[in-house]
Amino acid sequence: MLPPLQIEIEGTGISRPLSEHVNLLGGLLGQVIQEMAGPEMLELVETLRRLCKQAAQENRPEFREQAYTRIHSATYDELLWLLRAYTAFFHLVNQAEQQEIIRINRERAQQSTPERPRPESIDEAILALKQQGRTLDDVLTLLERLDIQPTVTAHPTEARRRSILYKQQHIAQMLSQQRRCQLTPEEQETLLLDLHNQITLLLGTAEVREERPTVRDEVEQGLYFIQSTIWEAVPRIYEDVRRALRRYYGADVDFRPFLRYRSWIGSDRDGNPYVTPEITRWTALTQRRLALQRYMEELRQLRRRLSLSDRYVAPPEELRRSLARDAREVSLPPHVLRQFRHESFRLKISYIMGRLHGLLQALDDPTQPAPDYDADAFVEDLRLLQRCLEACGLERIARHDQLTRLLVLAQTFGFHLVTLDVRQHSSVHEAAVAELLRLAGVENDYRALPESRRQELLAEELSNPRPLLPPGARVSEATRQVLETFAVIRELVQLDPRLVGSYIVSMTHTVSDLLEPMLLAKEVGLWHYERDPRTGKPGHVRCPIDFVPLFETIEDLEAAASRMEAILSHPVYRMQVAARGGFQEIMLGYSDSTKDGGYWMANWALHRAQEQLAEVCLRHGVDFRLFHGRGGTVGRGGGRANQAILAMPPVVHNGRIRFTEQGEVISFRYALPEIAHRHLEQIVNAMLRVVGLPAASGTDGTDPATRNRLMDELAARSMRAYRRLIDAPDFWSWYTRITPIDQISRLPIASRPVSRSSAREVDFESLRAIPWVFAWTQVRYLIPGWFGIGQALDELLQTSPEHLETLRTWYRSWPFFRTVLQNAQREMVRARLEIAAYYDRLLGDGPTAFHQMIEEDYHRARTAILRITDQESLLDHDPIIRKSVQLRNPYTDVLNLVQLELMRRIRSGAEADREPLRRALFLSINGIAAAMQSTG
């Protein structure tokens, strides 16, 4: 009998608990492979792992050649089993690593003291404020300024099926149980059997969906995380803040909630024809129903807990008056009234539940009248309970028990759960406005007008009370959809103003790009322009939503400040800003900018745009919030959220921030409650530091003009290198040959097409940034996360060696520069050019000039980064990540070699044989995504 799958990670710099977990899971996986596929299959899995490990550790590429030779001769069934085995291995290792993160955080918490709190915790931030002389009032004022809004999206970067995600969560729970509990021998035996069975089910579960998820599927997936881990994590964050204030200031005080969630799932229409107005309505109402149902559950628990008898705890007068009013307005079943006639607190909770039940009935049956009861009234009822408990001398129960948790939930999630954004491309609004103006007889060829005339015309129509669409006129399907979308928004905000918050305009280039959707909103009664009834002069605007420009390309980012200057200077738009309380949100796109200009240019253009946009808003006296459209990978603005906050320009730190949580990032950050809590506390820590301690995000004191000139030069050099690669005549042909981009475009992982034209017509311009990055990650080049910086840094240091000390100083003291270089290092360590060379040689007829260009820039980047950071090897500052990548590489290499073989067979085989090979190729894409812990 063969031994279980050998992992051999002890003594390699990995902690003993992680080593034990990985070896346990690997051993069980080996047993399951042997049981399901036989000892020969397990031997093949182990042989390939050993060969690739020897090739990596001993720098002996001939061992990798031997591995590929064996894969080349493998049967289809053998290739399929290799993919299943190695993919399952990475699913298991990823859970073990998450448990290791949780273990380390718990260990640090146990070792922490009030004087030395856990790093990146809320305690650490509050202590830092105290040490810098901030008073309690200062800290409370700072908390009042905080406005943190994570935004979940359905971007197509989560390759795993929900069935796989649920099994991973179950395995994580068992690993946690094993780590935390002292199990009896019988319990340990049961747990190992359960783990074995879960791994068996994992191996037997299809990795690839049979068909694309629908938008409703995506909504339900997002809501799963919101109503489970996020729902549980948010009250813990507020309790952390209260505890820190008690610990360091001796104060038990209330503060305004600062953390709220937003969502695009079910409302992001840009490029997704399946997000219809009906879907958006269904999404919002589903969220409302779920919020009300969760509150009913919370209230049942609270009612069970507050078993206070009026005979022992006399109800205050305020509670008695409230119950009398409730009795007039809410009808409760007689048995409930009898049951709680001497338990006033429970009776009050029952009346609250009765009101929520009425709201749920009205959702299910619109003919039923809904109670006049909103989230604010719900919060006030909970506050009444809190005051009455305090009046009874039960202050701890009032302020440090289940009621406080429910109050936080109500203030955070309201009756809307999460606020939706609607997003649409600017060209869609342009076409709809052109059609309406033509039908109204106002302008036959709006699209031919210059921008100045467009603005004049739009301003005239926005101030004109009559609608554009003549009675009975028929419009195109596209225009009907746009108008219906605004009508749905109007309907939803009338039900609850928090259901929809923003209308985001993709590819905002001009002032008219924002005026056009305002005109469409006016057409359905969502936007109102009102003159002063006495003088007839311009009065004011009424509008319940924000209009948000989205700047995405390098050109748009470089021009963002001047465009925002023009937008805020427009008299009608300025009235829109006034209608929103003098507030303007601005969104920045991290994905298209990197695809457009490369890693360094995109990062610098985004940094400068933030700085300049903040200055424009401040100059106009406008309160602003920047919305960061970050992806999960470094090539799309990913990385640790708290480091990204610290790296932002100091001028933007006004306490407000939004950022997207996309695709696989959602399941990584929110699948486990402890990981979700850690993610959120790091964000709050960073926001407290940058707003309360401005030096936290400062620079080394270099003259800004000098700094900007040097960074502009580096960005321009980097972009030239990047564009020289991707603009080369044969580049697109090479890229489509050596990467599985064609299969990625068909991968059924999201409702949205990968191309802006169609999923079957892919070229560079229409290809979205997500599959662009996804494909580079699969073949281990990862160029969106680093390429171009080699030429930029090397040329600068060659021509101006005196700048080396400047760059070293920046790395030590400028968070932005340090973060950009550290993120690039991480991607370079994860890149594996020796594996990429196989794709180039066997699929691209290489070695090609493209591979040589990439390899040369890699080595130039590595040399320059090591000189600037004074390291011996990349990621010396983060040896745990470096070691994790090194340990993963041999296993990932096997997946890459199998994928390579499948791509060769698809291209050389008969059409009749290609479909099963394509299915296997989909599985290889999932496997490598699991190994790399990222897609696009």
UniProtKB/Swiss-Prot annotation:
One Pfam entry for this protein is PEPcase
* pH-activity note: Optimum pH is 8.0.
Q: Where is the active site?
A: H155, K595
What SUPFAM superfamilies is this protein classified in? Phosphoenolpyruvate/pyruvate domain (SSF51621)
Cofactor detail note: Magnesium. Can also use Mn(2+) instead of Mg(2+).
Catalysed reactions, semicolon-separated:
oxaloacetate + phosphate = phosphoenolpyruvate + hydrogencarbonate
What is one process in the GO biological process aspect for this record?
oxaloacetate metabolic process
Cross-referenced PROSITE patterns: PEPCASE_1, PEPCASE_2
The Swiss-Prot or TrEMBL record lists the needed cofactor(s) as: Mg(2+); Mn(2+)
Q: Its Enzyme Commission number?
A: 4.1.1.31
Q: Which InterPro entries match?
A: PEP_COase, PEP_COase_bac/pln-type, PEP_COase_Lys_AS, PEPCASE_His_AS, Pyrv/PenolPyrv_kinase-like_dom
- Specify the enzyme's EC class, one word: lyase
List UniProt keywords, sorted A-Z: Allosteric enzyme, Carbon dioxide fixation, Lyase, Magnesium, Manganese
Functionally, this protein is described as follows: Forms oxaloacetate, a four-carbon dicarboxylic acid source for the tricarboxylic acid cycle.
Kindly give the NCBIfam families that the UniProt entry links to this protein.
PRK00009.1
Assigned protein family: Belongs to the PEPCase type 1 family.
User: What is the recorded name of this protein?
Assistant: Phosphoenolpyruvate carboxylase
Q: What is the lineage of its organism?
A: Bacteria, Pseudomonadati, Rhodothermota, Rhodothermia, Rhodothermales
